[in-house]
């Protein structure tokens, strides 16, 4: 499952009264930090409306509704405070600083590194 789907899976299992035997783990060595972003291209024809859309999504009441719909963590602190305490403390949804200490945002390192990565990944996946 993907990181943001853990909450959805937990809810489905609980609704069906099934035993839950999955644990969400971030390796101690770290991993990539997951994020989705809204951006406005510099040559956008309707920059003002795009900014209004982003501002709308950043409203705490809207961010909570978005969280409830997609069950992916919200970075909006005011929205997070509006969630049930059990959800706020769910480390699978909102990892703490200790869990994120060794995590990083992946960045493109150029064609040579990309080719090496893909080659190594194919080797790992091979029989």
Residue ranges and their predicted role:
Residues 1-27:
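Ligand-binding pocket segment of bilobal, Venus flytrap-like solute-binding proteins
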Residues 3-6, 37, 50:
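A general structural signal for well-ordered alpha-helical packing
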Residues 3-7, 29-32, 44-45, 59-63:
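Solvent-exposed loop/turn segments at secondary-structure junctions
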Residues 18-42, 88:
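Periplasmic-binding protein-like
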Residues 41-101:
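Mature extracytoplasmic/periplasmic domains
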Residues 97-127:
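Conserved C-terminal helix/tail region of periplasmic/extracytoplasmic solute-binding proteins
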């Amino acid at each position: 499952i993907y990181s943001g789907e853990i909450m959805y899976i937990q809810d489905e299992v609980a609704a069906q009264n099934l035993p839950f035997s999955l644990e969400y783990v971030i390796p101690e060595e770290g991993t990539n930090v997951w994020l989705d972003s809204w951006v406005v291209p510099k040559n956008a024809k309707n920059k003002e409306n795009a900014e209004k859309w982003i501002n709308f999504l950043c409203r705490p009441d809207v961010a909570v509704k978005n969280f409830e719909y997609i069950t992916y963590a919200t970075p909006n602190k005011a929205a997070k405070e509006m969630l049930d305490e059990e959800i706020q403390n769910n480390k699978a949804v909102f990892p703490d600083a200790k869990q994120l200490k060794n995590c990083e945002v992946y960045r493109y390192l150029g064609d040579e590194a990309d080719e090496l990565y893909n080659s190594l990944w194919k080797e790992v996946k091979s029989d």
